[in-house]
Design a protein with these regions (language model features):
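Short, Lys/Arg-enriched, disordered terminal segments
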Residues: 1-9
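Long, continuous compositionally biased terminal/linker segments
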Residues: 4, 56-94
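Conserved functional micro-motifs across diverse proteins
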Residues: 11-15, 31, 49, 53, ...
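Short cationic amphipathic helices and targeting signals
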Residues: 18-25, 96-106
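Short, well-structured hydrophobic secondary-structure segments
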Residues: 24-70
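Glycine-rich, aromatic-bearing surface loops/beta-hairpins
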Residues: 98-102, 107-134
């Protein structure tokens, strides 16, 4: 008997109860996080333990991930740097500089809209769009 991994089911499970934002900004990742922390009251920090390393075209690319876990809640925010040295973590979103994943708890529409509006008003932010997992 041959076992097969159902990747579609894994993807569906991973994205269950998540919200995903794509952000275009003219800011460096640390500058963007500093503004998020100041304006949203969050505490995004670089997490080198979950940094993504990709090897493409015989070169290594490193994509930083900033993380913030809300107090008294399982909700965790991950901010992925989508571009490194001309290569993209998610090439289908080349126009997005950052991908923001909210995971491990339900984020209602009011909270998500508040986050989107606050981020849109930050200096250097050009676009904030909610993305789907499809």
């Amino acid at each position: 008997m041959k076992l097969r991994l159902d990747v579609d089911e894994l993807n569906d499970d991973f994205f269950e109860e998540t919200r995903l934002l794509g952000i275009t900004a003219t800011l460096k990742n640390y500058q963007f996080c500093m503004q998020l922390n100041t304006n949203l009251g969050y505490d995004f920090r670089l997490n080198p333990e979950i940094e993504i390393h990709l090897r493409r075209k015989e070169r290594s690319y490193y994509f930083s991930i900033y993380q913030y876990k809300e107090v008294n809640s399982p909700l965790t925010h991950y901010l992925y740097q989508n571009q490194f040295d001309g290569e993209y973590l998610l090439p289908e979103f080349k126009h997005m500089d950052f991908i923001w994943l909210m995971k491990y708890d339900l984020v209602d529409d009011d909270k998500c809209n508040w986050i989107k509006q606050t981020v849109r008003n930050l200096s250097g932010v050009q676009l904030v769009a909610e993305l789907t997992n499809e």
